[in-house]
């Protein structure tokens, strides 16, 4: 059994989804922070659990050719990224391997298409930054401490400039966070502890950054806050932005769920609609539809009837406006719990939260008996659990398509098609 502060020389066998190296010491698993496959390292044990331990690198004795110097001064502290110490190939291979091993672990036979990663920097069209002592940043790993930084390679340059400007202008106020979205314009929303007048800030902001098309504000004293629970007040503009994706225009309000990586999202949506293959006269359900993205794309490309269901009322209001703006009439949208949907359907798209489908949702799918289920997931583990829960009635009929939707982080998305067993 290894002990804290003991030093070992090890060879790294693989890299896990969190960007850490994996090795064994006398058959005991050790995760080594920021180590790469094939590297020979001197390590120090930092934490010991019953079945595994964590270690830090003391020295790299043999370095991987795929190692890169992180282009971020706060990488070792910030909890945002996991793969800045490697090239993008290592990350893509690791994420592809993680998805494959998850299906294998769950004893689901599948084939896999090569992971899709069209862009790996400056892709984030949405950020929530937290205020520290003098500036904004992301949370430190495993804590709520703020790691301040002026630049982030995942963000648009304008986000970095606006966050620095905001930190300077609102210093001394009750500022606690800054929420920004980029689409046809930029939405900026400072979040405070107390009600705050930002008229002067708003005027200077829009003068210096003409791309800012709308400014909102919110305040809350809650220790942990979620955007969907905040009450937003529009200070300038109309309170929303528009994004064009897959040929359609979508309204995005502050609470709207919308993928942060447009380039990759478009490729995922195109594949999902291809697998859905909506036919004339069919009834299609887009469950967990959010602002209606995939359902409206499907409706715009077919003569099927599409039902969009989402539990968040504000998202359905946006979805209805999106349908109207894109002149899509073969769609019905309703704010409700997806597990209570009861209309006859031929096929459906499901894009559940990270925890996967509830038992009620699984029961609903088995009761509705759609011929095809296109499943989009941000969590391979829960995707596999749900596939197994449906396996008495449905079989995997497509390869597993994997998307690096959040490059440099530990997250990955997948999409599959399940077909009803005759």
PLM regions and their residue ranges:
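Extended interfacial segments that mediate partner engagement and assembly in macromolecular machines
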Residues: 58-70, 77-175
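Short, acidic/hydrophobic/Gly-rich beta-strand patch recurrent on exposed beta strands
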Residues: 21-26, 137-141, 319
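Terminal RNA-binding accessory module
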Residues: 1-70, 74, 334, 338
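Nucleotide donor/acceptor-binding cores
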Residues: 125, 186, 281-282
